[in-house]
């Protein structure tokens, strides 16, 4: 398999970060939640997850130049009054890494932790290799006890070549009730991974179980398709998604879940369509889609903007998008693009009146 060494490191990093997140989610304390300037909640686990991934990748791939594009920086943790939070994160990270032989006996200081978090301040771009991380994708889902993901991808010369999604709360069985992935298991926690040209695989997050190759839904009739969208109305225009679904003839109600767990569920055929149309003025960040995009495309799906253009991850931290992001299989995509085009045109016409 291509990128075998990088994939092993990424799976280890994402799995350990997910273990840290699970520990925090189980005992979520009010003091864990801080407020960032953009009003989205950020947690102790967010910082801890980023530190774990940064430290594991650096150690496992020590012979290579290391560039990480990630969501968090340590600015808030360096402010007065943050010492208790910083020490708590440092302890969590140390406890998590102590389970790994390669880190046994090495204890991080708070300064080590801040440095690890700030390794994620790369800008990305079209040249070289860049790891791309969302340490907790779906922070609001995490805080509610719902879906979230540790999402880690690798860009090489601006192209996505590897992606790992650790989804601690995603059942092994289908979340759409169709049970296409043929699991009757009630086990929870999935790890999805893909490398370019090698397909997408899923396995239980907390076990050495054998990975299973997965495929997107083969549904050709939109009436039989189910579609995913963001749980939070603040993240996506649900009215526009509803209009598109109506034009397609989709009969099933939308499945609304947080985070790139949607991409994982789509890759194994739980749903057939994903619609994401952010509110005007919102700029999509690459860490919200890099890992998920390759997980779906390697499983046979197509990921584009609303005009049908492939997503371009080579422009730095932000995606330069036409309106939104849509995902479907090869058969449904032409029908979906037409429904999207017609619905957007109607919406623009209505707003001009």
Curated annotation (Swiss-Prot):
InterPro entries according to UniProt: DPNP (IPR006239), Inositol_monoP_metal-BS (IPR020583), Inositol_monoP_superfamily (IPR051090), Inositol_monophosphatase-like (IPR000760)
Catalytic activity: 3'-phosphoadenylyl sulfate + H2O = adenosine 5'-phosphosulfate + phosphate; adenosine 3',5'-bisphosphate + H2O = AMP + phosphate; adenosine 2',5'-bisphosphate + H2O = AMP + phosphate; 1D-myo-inositol 1,4-bisphosphate + H2O = 1D-myo-inositol 4-phosphate + phosphate
The EC number(s) this enzyme carries: 3.1.3.7, 3.1.3.57
This protein's record includes keyword Calcium: yes
Pathway, per record: Signal transduction; phosphatidylinositol signaling pathway
Chain positions recorded as AMP binding sites: 235, 259, 262, 276, 288
Protein name per the record: 3'(2'),5'-bisphosphate nucleotidase 1
Species annotation: Arabidopsis thaliana (Mouse-ear cress)
């Amino acid at each position: 398999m291509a990128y075998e060494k990088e994939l092993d490191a990424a799976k280890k990093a994402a799995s350990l970060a997910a273990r840290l997140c699970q520990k925090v989610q189980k005992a979520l304390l009010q003091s864990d939640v801080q407020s960032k300037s953009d009003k989205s909640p950020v947690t102790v686990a967010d910082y801890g997850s980023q530190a774990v991934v940064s430290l594991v990748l650096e150690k496992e791939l020590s012979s290579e130049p290391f560039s990480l594009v990630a969501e968090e920086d340590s600015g808030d943790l360096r402010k007065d009054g943050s010492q208790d939070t910083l020490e708590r994160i440092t302890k969590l990270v140390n406890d998590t890494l102590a389970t790994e032989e390669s880190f046994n006996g090495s204890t991080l200081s708070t300064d080590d932790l801040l440095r690890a978090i700030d390794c994620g301040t790369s800008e990305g771009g079209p040249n070289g290799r860049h790891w791309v991380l969302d340490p907790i994708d779906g922070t609001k889902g995490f805080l509610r006890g719902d879906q979230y993901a540790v999402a880690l991808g690798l860009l090489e010369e601006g192209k996505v070549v590897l992606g790992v999604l650790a989804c601690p709360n995603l059942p092994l069985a289908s979340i759409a009730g169709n049970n296409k992935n043929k699991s009757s298991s009630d086990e929870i926690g999935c790890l999805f991974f893909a490398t370019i040209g090698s397909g997408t695989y899923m396995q239980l997050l907390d076990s050495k179980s054998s990975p299973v190759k997965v495929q997107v839904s083969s549904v050709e009739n939109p009436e039989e398709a189910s579609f995913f969208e963001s749980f939070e109305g603040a993240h996506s225009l649900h009215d526009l998604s509803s209009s598109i679904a109506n034009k397609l003839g989709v009969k099933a109600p939308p499945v609304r879940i947080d985070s790139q767990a949607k991409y994982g569920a789509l890759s194994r055929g739980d749903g057939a369509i994903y619609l994401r149309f952010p509110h005007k003025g919102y700029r999509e960040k690459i860490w919200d889609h890099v890992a998920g995009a390759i997980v779906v495309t390697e499983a046979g799906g197509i990921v584009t903007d609303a005009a049908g253009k492939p997503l371009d991850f080579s422009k730095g931290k932000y995606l330069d998008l036409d309106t939104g992001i849509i995902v479907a299989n090869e058969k449904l995509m032409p029908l979906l693009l037409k429904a999207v085009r017609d619905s957007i045109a109607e919406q623009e016409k209505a707003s001009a009146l």
